[in-house]
Amino acid sequence: MTEPLTETPELSAKYAWFFDLDGTLAEIKPHPDQVVVPDNILQGLQLLATASDGALALISGRSMVELDALAKPYRFPLAGVHGAERRDINGKTHIVHLPDAIARDISVQLHTVIAQYPGAELEAKGMAFALHYRQAPQHEDALMTLAQRITQIWPQMALQQGKCVVEIKPRGTSKGEAIAAFMQEAPFIGRTPVFLGDDLTDESGFAVVNRLGGMSVKIGTGATQASWRLAGVPDVWSWLEMITTALQQKRENNRSDDYESFSRSI
């Protein structure tokens, strides 16, 4: 059973932090280009990353280029395109490549067909494709059928449903696989994973985090594998602010203790 999340984690423990972006750190907007992560939330993430020796990553369906732009001026480890591309703490990238001929043929087919559905949008991500229908929900079934046809023609591709979107991505890639990969690397290894996400695309991440004995947090309504729930993005912001406030207080207390110890020694 998923429980409401009302408390922050014990700060003395070692956590590895993973955050989805759209619908978790930032409100969903009619168009992806309109999404913004508030400056104070980015500052909080940086503080949390520093306190955790860098063990914080953004896990998203967006590309890593988009994630870096949204996280400026900070630079975090990332998993983009649902794990099809990943950047570790050292800046090394791990990318699943799609043969150029396949990517080109899929793109041509999708561009040709999606023109029949006004309001629907095709987002090409190199090795993956997203069919957005937030502005044209009446086309959901048709776009799902289109995506299924693509995966039948190219079985190395798989479907990933999300909120008002269906994605076509390399088979075997997922947010869960990305989190599992991070958890095998420094500085994440040996820590307890915490993952916050709002969408169907995040369920694979929840499954991995649960298996590792971590904290999985669903944002919003709907059935989920997550153990905890926050009602919406403002609740995520409030929860993060509680954590960062506690971290700052802990840091101030440590400085005070260090000063007192120094004073007694002279």
Curated annotation (Swiss-Prot):
Q: Where does Mg(2+) bind?
A: D20, D22, D198
Pathway named in the protein's UniProt entry: Glycan biosynthesis; trehalose biosynthesis
Protein name in UniProt: Trehalose-6-phosphate phosphatase
Give binding positions for substrate. D20, L21, D22
UniProt catalytic activity: alpha,alpha-trehalose 6-phosphate + H2O = alpha,alpha-trehalose + phosphate
CDD domains linked to this entry: HAD_TPP (cd01627)
Q: Where are the transmembrane segments?
A: none
Q: Look at the named UniProt entry and state the broad enzyme category this protein falls under.
A: hydrolase
Q: What triggers its expression?
A: By cold-shock, osmotic-shock and during the transition to stationary phase. Expression is partially dependent on RpoS.
